[in-house]
Amino acid sequence: MRRHAIILAAGKGTRMKSKKYKVLHEVAGKPMVEHVLESVKGSGVDQVVTIVGHGAESVKGHLGERSLYSFQEKQLGTAHAVQMAKSHLEDKEGTTIVVCGDTPLITKETLETLIAHHEDANAQATVLSASIQQPYGYGRIVRNASGRLERIVEEKDATQAEKDINEISSGIFAFNNKTLFEKLTQVKNDNAQGEYYLPDVLSLILNDGGIVEVYRTNDVEEIMGVNDRVMLSQAEKAMQRRTNHYHMLNGVTIIDPDSTFIGPDVTIGSDTVIEPGVRINGRTEIGEDVVIGQYSEINNSTIENGACIQQSVVNDASVGANTKVGPFAQLRPGAQLGADVKVGNFVEIKKADLKDGAKVSHLSYIGDAVIGERTNIGCGTITVNYDGENKFKTIVGKDSFVGCNVNLVAPVTIGDDVLVAAGSTITDDVPNDSLAVARARQTTKEGYRK
C-alpha cells in the first residue's frame, strides 16, 4: 500500500517572538521540521508534502528535494492547511499521515505503529492520542459509552466536563487518503476560532458510519509541540536525555548526562568516556576507548580509537588513533592528525596534515602545512602562511626537529632529519640532514650595566 505524509509547517509562530520561521528553530542542532521529516521518511512513507507559508523559501532551503511543497497563503486552520496538498495527493491511493512540523520528538517507530494500527483496523482515520496530567491547550478525545471515539473537541470549544478529560489529541493522524480529501471539502468553520479544524474530518467520517481509531502512545514527550522558547528548551532537554540514554545503553560512559550535549547524528564507540560539559554536534564519528575531556566541543569530526581530547575545540577535523589533543587546543577545518600525534596546550591547527607521531606541544599555529612522521615542532613555532592576499604551504619532512620560537615563512619546504635552530626565521628551503640557523648572532657587552 502506498503511503504519503503531510507536514504542517505554515504557522507563523508568533509566540516564539522571533524573526526566524518557527519550524526552523533548532533542537539538538537541527531545525525542528527536519527532525519531523526524518522520522516521517524513516516510517516508510513514499512521498512527503510540506505545507509552507511565511518563510517558505527558508524551509525549502533546509529540506530541499526531500519533500514536495504546497503554499498556504492564509492560515485558516489545520484542515485548510491539509487541503493545500490537494494538487499533489488528491487522486492517490493508500494511507496519508498528517504531522505537525513543530513536534521534533516524534519518532519513526511511533509513526510506523500508528500506520500499522490504522491499516490493520481498515480504518478511514486514526488519531494518535496520549493521556497527560495538564491537558490545557490540547484538543480532548471524547469517547462514547463503549469507549469508542465520539469526537475531538478543541480547548476553546470545550465544556468544563470536556476540559476535565486528560486524553488529548496529538495533532498527528493517519487517513485513508481519498477519504481525507473527500471530507475536507465538507469541513465548516463554525467554531470559536473561525477556523477549519482537521479533527472535524473524523466527525464527518463517523457520521457516515466509517471507522475511526484511536492509538494511544505512552511516551507523552514524543507528541510535545513547541510554541515558545520555554517549550523549545523542554524539547531540547528531552532530546538530549533520549540521545544520551541511547549511547549509555550502548556502552558509552557519560559522567554527567545533564550537562552533556550529543547531537542526533553522532556515533560513539563502546568504552568511550564523555566528561561533563561536552558538546558533540553534526555528523561526528567517535571510536572506542576515547576520552572526551570536560568542556570540549566537537563538530563534524572523526575521532579514532584511543584518542583523548582535553578541553579543546575540534571543527571539521580528523584525529587519529591514540592521539592526544589539548588542553586548550583548537583544530580548525581541514586539520588531519595521524596516529600517536600530540597537539598540546594553546596550539591551533588549520588545514594541516600531521603525520603519525608528530608533536606540536605548546603555543603554536600550524596552518596550510604538512608535518612529517615523528617530527617535533617546538614551542611558539608559527607557519607564516598568509601574505595578505594568498595562502601558501609549509612542508616539514619526517624525523625533523624545529626549535622554539621559529617562523616558517611559506612557501617553504624543510627536509627529513633537519634541525631548525630556536629563534630562526626560515624563508628558504632546507635540504635533508641539515642544520638551519637564521637569526642574528648574539652580542654581549660585559660590564655595560656598571
From Swiss-Prot:
Annotated active site: 362 (proton acceptor)
Sequence positions that bind acetyl-CoA: 385-386, 422, 439
UniProt GO molecular function: glucosamine-1-phosphate N-acetyltransferase activity; magnesium ion binding; UDP-N-acetylglucosamine diphosphorylase activity
InterPro entries: Bifunctional_GlmU (IPR005882), GlmU-like (IPR050065), GlmU_C_LbH (IPR038009), Hexapep (IPR001451), Hexapep_transf_CS (IPR018357), NTP_transferase_dom (IPR005835), Nucleotide-diphossugar_trans (IPR029044), Trimer_LpxA-like_sf (IPR011004)
GO annotation terms (biological process): cell morphogenesis; cell wall organization; lipid A biosynthetic process; peptidoglycan biosynthetic process; regulation of cell shape; UDP-N-acetylglucosamine biosynthetic process
Region spans: N-acetyltransferase: 251-450
Annotated Gene3D superfamilies: Hexapeptide repeat proteins, Spore Coat Polysaccharide Biosynthesis Protein SpsA, Chain A
Entry EC no(s): 2.7.7.23, 2.3.1.157
UniProt keyword list: Acyltransferase, Cell shape, Cell wall biogenesis/degradation, Cytoplasm, Magnesium, Metal-binding, Multifunctional enzyme, Nucleotidyltransferase, Peptidoglycan synthesis, Repeat, Transferase
Chain intervals for the UniProt region annotation (Linker): 230-250
Signal sequence range: none
Cofactor: Mg(2+)
Cofactor note text: Binds 1 Mg(2+) ion per subunit.
Subcellular location: Cytoplasm
Predominant subcellular localization, coarse grouping: cytoplasm
Catalytic activity, reaction form: alpha-D-glucosamine 1-phosphate + acetyl-CoA = N-acetyl-alpha-D-glucosamine 1-phosphate + CoA + H(+); N-acetyl-alpha-D-glucosamine 1-phosphate + UTP + H(+) = UDP-N-acetyl-alpha-D-glucosamine + diphosphate
Metabolic or biological pathway: Nucleotide-sugar biosynthesis; UDP-N-acetyl-alpha-D-glucosamine biosynthesis; N-acetyl-alpha-D-glucosamine 1-phosphate from alpha-D-glucosamine 6-phosphate (route II): step 2/2; Nucleotide-sugar biosynthesis; UDP-N-acetyl-alpha-D-glucosamine biosynthesis; UDP-N-acetyl-alpha-D-glucosamine from N-acetyl-alpha-D-glucosamine 1-phosphate: step 1/1; Bacterial outer membrane biogenesis; LPS lipid A biosynthesis
Binding locations of UDP-N-acetyl-alpha-D-glucosamine: 8-11, 22, 72, 77-78, 139, 154, 227, 332, 350, 365, 376
Pfam families according to UniProt: Hexapep, NTP_transferase
GO cellular component: cytoplasm; membrane
List of residues binding Mg(2+): 102, 227
Region described as Pyrophosphorylase: 1-229
Assembly mode: Homotrimer.
Annotated family: In the N-terminal section; belongs to the N-acetylglucosamine-1-phosphate uridyltransferase family. In the C-terminal section; belongs to the transferase hexapeptide repeat family.
Its biological purpose: Catalyzes the last two sequential reactions in the de novo biosynthetic pathway for UDP-N-acetylglucosamine (UDP-GlcNAc). The C-terminal domain catalyzes the transfer of acetyl group from acetyl coenzyme A to glucosamine-1-phosphate (GlcN-1-P) to produce N-acetylglucosamine-1-phosphate (GlcNAc-1-P), which is converted into UDP-GlcNAc by the transfer of uridine 5-monophosphate (from uridine 5-triphosphate), a reaction catalyzed by the N-terminal domain.
Protein name: Bifunctional protein GlmU
